[in-house]
Each structure stands twice: as C-alpha cells, then as structure tokens.
Amino acid sequence: MEEQTGTETNLGKKKRSNIFLWIVAVLITIISIFYQNTTGPTYPQKGHVVFNGKQIDYKLDRSALINQDCPVKIYINDSTIKGSLIWKRFNTRDNESSKPMRYENGYLVSELDKQDKMAAKLQYYIQLSSSQPGSQNEIHEYIPDKSGVVIRFRGDVPFMVIIFHILFIFSFELLSLKTGMEFFRKEPKYKAYTFWTIGLAAVGGLILGPLVQYYAFGEFWTGFPFGFDLTDNKMIIAFAAWIVALIALYKSKKPGYWVLGATILTIVIFLIPHSVLSGNVPK
C-alpha cells in the first residue's frame, strides 16, 4: 500500500513538473510573439513631435501592397498647420519629390504613389509648416526626421498561407522550448519532442515560409547560397541545429546537451526581429 502511494506521489510530481514546463514554454512563446509583433523593419514607426505648442502623434507605415496608393496621414486638429509629403526611391541619388497634404477632418492626408515592383522601397517623411504670429517667417518640423522612414512594397499573400505559416512557426518555437526544458527532468523524453520540433520547423519555415515570400516578393528563397536574407538564413540554421540534436540522440552519450544547445540557438534566432535584411529582391 505504501509502495503504491509512493508511486502515485512520484507520478503526481512528474505530471506537475511537466505542466509547469509547458506553462513556462507557453509564456516565453507569448512574449516572443509580442516582441516579433512590435519590432522589425516592416511594422509601423510610431512616435510624437511637439509643434506649435502641441503634441502630434504619428504612425508611419513601413509595409504596403503594390499596385495601390499607400495613404499617409497624421492627426493635427489644426487647420493652420500645413504639411508636405516628401519622398524618393530608397538607396538612390534621386532628387526628392514633394506634394502638399490635404486637411481633412483634423488630419493631414496624402498618398505615396503605387509601385508595381515587388520589394520596391521608398524613403519618405512629412514636413510640417506654420507661420509665426505677426511674422512672415515659417517654422518647420519633420516627421520623424529628414532621414525619413523606409517603406517596402509587397504582393498580397493569401490569408490562409499567412495564418498557417504563423501557426507552424510559433508552434515550432513552443515545441523547441519544451524539448530543451526536458533537460531539467529526471526522465526526459527528447525523441518524440525533437521529431515534432523538426516537423514543425520544416513545414512552417522551409515550406510555408518560402511560399509567403514568393507571394510577397516573387522569390521562394533568397538566403544562402543565393543571397543574404536573414529570415531564410536563420531558419535554415535553426533547422540544421535540430537535425544535429536528433543525430545526437542516437550517437551521443549525453544528447541532452545537444538538445539544450539547439533550444538556446532557437531562442537567439527568435530574438532577431522578423524581416531584417529580407525582401531585397526588386524586379
């Protein structure tokens, strides 16, 4: 009877330990999702400036669809403030182009002209102008500044392709975390978790990832050996790390260290903002 009770107690401890590790893995994954959703070169640049004695908040897009104008607007609620939208092609010696912004319902509004090339990039900013009371001189402010914001134009990716890509990629991160955490259990179950981790990485990163890139930029793969796309390269590095960990499960006397190493490398990779050095494939 005492032996049975002891066995049940051990099983309960193992179950609680497993649940705890799953909770930690889920929390880290959620934090990672939030981090990826607020960093990187494709998410809107937010901030504020103080002009004419008032704070003006802005949110400037850094990603837009090809073949349609990209709206640019900021809320100022002051019809005496004038605005100009200024832009040029990114990384060129082109002269800047400029057009006045319209005042509509408290907003200064304009548009960046549509682009017909995938991965085309424009560098743009807004110039605010206002006359000083009792003076003919104008004061100016630049949003965000004269160096501007770089916006990249892409093709339209089917909704379900995006959804499944995101689902598989973050499931890969979740499983990689849980697999690595098995290192801290007395009876780790590396093998099944490692196979699941590799499968999710293959589908999310090596099948759906290139498909997303093809729809967005017209190329399936622009990482090694064809280019320097960091999103592609970090995915292939993570996948290779888990293949090495899988081999270690059969060949190494201490495979747990290889699994833990693959997990740590995966975490580091997910700390790199999404789309850095990506989509540089203009036609």
Tell where the protein language model's regions lie, with residue ranges.
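Interfacial segments of alpha-helical transmembrane regions
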Residues: 187-202, 259
